[in-house]
Amino acid sequence: MIKKFDKKDEESGSGSNPFRHLEKSAVLQEARIFNETPINPRRCLHILTKILYLLNQGEHFGTTEATEAFFAMTRLFQSNDQTLRRMCYLTIKEMATISEDVIIVTSSLTKDMTGKEDVYRGPAIRALCRITDGTMLQAIERYMKQAIVDKVSSVSSSALVSSLHMMKISYDVVKRWVNEAQEAASSDNIMVQYHALGVLYHLKKNDRLAVSKMLNKFTKSGLKSQFAYCMLIRIASRLLKENEEGHESPVFDFIESCLRNKHEMVIYEAASAIIHLPNCTARELAPAVSVLQLFCSSPKPALRYAAVRTLNKVAMKHPSAVTACNLDLENLITDSNRSIATLAITTLLKTGSESSVDRLMKQISSFVSEISDEFKVVVVQAISALCQKYPRKHSVMMTFLSNMLRDDGGFEYKRAIVDCIIHIVEENPESKEAGLAHLCEFIEDCEHTVLATKILHLLGKEGPRTPVPSKYIRFIFNRVVLENEAVRAAAVSALAKFGAQNENLLPSILVLLQRCMMDTDDEVRDRATFYLNVLQQRQMALNATYIFNGLTVSVPGMEKALHQYTLEPSEKPFDMKSIPLATAPVFEQKAEITLVSTKPEKLAPSRQDIFQEQLAAIPEFMNLGPLFKSSEPVQLTEAETEYFVRCVKHMFTNHIVFQFDCTNTLNDQLLEKVTVQVEPSEAYEVLCCVPAPSLPYNQPGVCYTLVRLPEDDSIAAAGTFSCTMKFTVRDCDPDTGVPTEEGYDDEYVLEDLEVTVSDHIQKVMKPNFAAAWEEVGNTFEKEETFALSSTKTLEEAVNNIITFLGMQPCERSDKVPENKNSHSLYLAGVYRGGYDLLVRSRLALADGVTMQVTVRSKEGTPVDVILASVG
């Protein structure tokens, strides 16, 4: 019986959790009563509950003590008490991984799963599968097959769910149960049908054709379970995304037909699936949006919430498709559920006209303080999207955001506001001073180090270019006086940027930096000393290199290189060119703003750092030097062919490594000694091939081809390679995968592979392009004019140039202002070998686009390559 606590105990909270002060040693001591005769079910139940509570609270049980408690617990199978037996099953599952010799209960569990007590059979199956390994699975295979098709739904579901878990241990054994799973899928029980469909999908998910057949079968025969329908919709949408089929396919028709299902769950799943399909047109979205519009007026809050949240996502990409729902959304603004009201307003912000912005902002202001931080973030993201859509409304937005910034709130909420203000400042030059003023006010009382350093970085970047830069110095130096070490260090860097760009402020900045040299923190002192010495030289080139633009190398790569340098002392100075470059950040489309992640940010190695490590581990590539650039994968086969091959081009100083990722999609073949032979155009030289030892069915493998680049860089800039995959084939049994002993040689022709000028250039960001331009100098400057007769707009010309050259646009010059007939594009990069490369392109629109290209580098070769490739 449950103990009744005194009312006073309840109020004080002392009796709310009877297990709060449990000690592991005392509980294990109590577990000795499991060995007593006769068994006392009530006491044993209480002790098992305590053990499970400790395990779920994260209490560590040693192997010995866990095994002793487990063995004692096995005696409880002698009792016929139903509740005690089911508690034993739970304990077995929890202790399976921490106890030794858990298989001793196999016979007891097997007896229960095949017995007449239905209440035992399901839990016994789940417990047995938890302790079974791959070697024991075949012993219970017959029982599992029987259980899957059992007439008792709880037993069948238990066996099916256990089968899903057993796939991780022994996929091949579970694969033999496919006929039983097919039979269970026709069950009248909704949960059995749902679980059976899950098992069938996971058995076939690596075979697209089998999944398509399964989908076709169930869409024709129909299902009784709404849960199974939801899973089938998810399988169908995944198939559409993978196959990139047109939306005219029967699979899309099935998803659309589910919009007319009698279950609301299925209707919503179908609408959500259609909305999340890539490349969906407004016409294809219309039925899904209509269904969600009906849900907006549902009496059920959960349905209204689901509808408005999904419409909110649609509005990011297809605002015009949601416009029809505006009246329903306006009715939801006054919804008693604040989450629904918030989403309704933020959706309206994305779909409404410019004239409705002021009214909506007033409505948000009336209740924004009442909603949770999570939804405040959604509001801020909607405002950010709105700023991009209606730039002239930035002053209204800025006022609203600054008021929100003063309110109480957590880190994620404040970060979203700060990011939004920074975005407005960068996109709208006329809002710069107002935005910086609000941020300066915020850092005066900011408790978040990350945000303070981010704002100081922005002040250092944008502040020196404002009409009155001196007004920001006080706010920055206050951080040096009042804040922690990280913020003080960021403030020192910001001060240095003001001194580097404003000659009249330099004497004051030097005085402030001298004061910073007395700081208690060595990072702050080091920065102050470094910047002071650079600024005292009064050289623009030094300022550009060490203050404005900073390092462009990979930080994890630099850490490894420096560590290696310290292990092998050398008289030669450390060479910065031995470090891989950092890849330029890829800015997301602003329309696709996602919820702010709550996970802590880590300095994870980049894709290029991972490739560098993988290639360095291959003996043939050890002496190629640092990896300069890795391209995006290029597909060399059609989607539905026998073999799937794609290539990643790894560029080094004098070599290129082609990495071929190969997959064999034939289940009756094993491929061995797989290589890709490349036939280059003249001047390139193939040095060696590193084969993939074997390619079993559906398991990816990698082979490499090493090519020496021509010495004449103007020839090396572009080339075409014909590719042929060569291998030894061994036929094998599709069911067992066992190959024959004899093999034969074969080959497969792949599509041609192109090397372009962009493969030789790595993007780097230059925050201050003018300073970088002066730093490089005009020693190797060249200028030419070209006519782009086929290009009709400046935007098209800018995008084509950026894509072709593979360089990083600077100073936001990739954005062409409206109604302009001329534009300047600034591009920065590093050419293979470590040479800085800058391009200034002046574009004029007349009959087509005329382009004047000026290229600078510290070497002549990169300049010639760029002009030759453009011409």
Curated annotation (Swiss-Prot):
Repeat positions for HEAT: 64-101, 283-320, 321-355, 356-392, 395-430, 467-504
Keyword Ion transport in annotation: no
Keywords linked to the UniProt accession: Cytoplasm, Cytoplasmic vesicle, ER-Golgi transport, Golgi apparatus, Membrane, Phosphoprotein, Protein transport, Repeat, Transport
InterPro entries per the UniProt record, alphabetical: ARM-like, ARM-type_fold, Clathrin/coatomer_adapt-like_N, Clathrin_app_Ig-like_sf, Coatomer/calthrin_app_sub_C, Coatomer_g_Cpla, Coatomer_gsu, Coatomer_gsu_app_Ig-like_dom
Gene Ontology cellular component annotations, sorted alphabetically: COPI vesicle coat; cytosol; endoplasmic reticulum; endoplasmic reticulum-Golgi intermediate compartment; Golgi membrane; growth cone
Membrane topology: Peripheral membrane protein
Residue numbers of Phosphothreonine PTMs: T594
Region of interest (Disordered), ranges: 1-20
GO biological process, one term: intracellular protein transport
SUPFAM superfamilies cross-referenced by the UniProt entry: ARM repeat, Clathrin adaptor appendage domain, Subdomain of clathrin and coatomer appendage domain
Chief location of this protein within or outside the cell: cytoplasm
Biased composition (Basic and acidic residues): 1-11
Location in or out of the cell: Cytoplasm, Cytosol; Golgi apparatus membrane; Cytoplasmic vesicle, COPI-coated vesicle membrane
Repeat found in the keyword field: yes
Domain of life: Eukaryota
Molecular-function GO term, any one: structural molecule activity
Family assignment from sequence similarity: Belongs to the COPG family.
Assembly mode: Oligomeric complex. Binds to CDC42. Interacts with JAGN1. Interacts with TMED10 (via cytoplasmic domain).
Protein name, UniProt field: Coatomer subunit gamma-2
